[in-house]
């Protein structure tokens, strides 16, 4: 039984190698709205142009200023 399972696993790995799976490691996933330009932080009323960050309401305006 174990040898049949090993053969099946080997065949599956040869037909569909793990390197063919697309990984999300090289894609930025933390700011998808900024990537698609859905949020214009420069025009936000909470954006501080001197500090180049948002003073409050960080769930609306990105990036947040450190407290």
UniProtKB/Swiss-Prot annotation:
Assigned GO CC terms: extracellular region
Example of a GO MF term: ion channel inhibitor activity
Cleavable signal peptide: 1-20
Residue pairs linked by disulfide bridges in the UniProt entry: 53-65, 54-61, 58-64
Residues passing through the membrane, by range: none
High-level lineage: Eukaryota, Metazoa, Spiralia, Lophotrochozoa, Mollusca
Species the sequence originates in: Conus tessulatus
Keywords: Cleavage on pair of basic residues, Disulfide bond, Hydroxylation, Neurotoxin, Secreted, Signal, Toxin
Family classification: Belongs to the conotoxin M superfamily.
Name the record gives this protein: Conotoxin TsMMSK-011
Modified residues (4-hydroxyproline): 63
Keyword match Secreted: yes
């Amino acid at each position: 039984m174990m040898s049949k399972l090993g053969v099946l696993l080997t065949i599956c790995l040869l037909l569909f190698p793990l390197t063919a799976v697309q990984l999300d490691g090289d894609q930025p996933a933390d700011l998808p709205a900024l990537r698609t330009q859905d949020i214009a932080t420069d025009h936000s009323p909470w954006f501080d142009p001197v500090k180049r960050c948002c003073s409050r309401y960080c769930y609306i305006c990105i990036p947040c200023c450190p407290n």
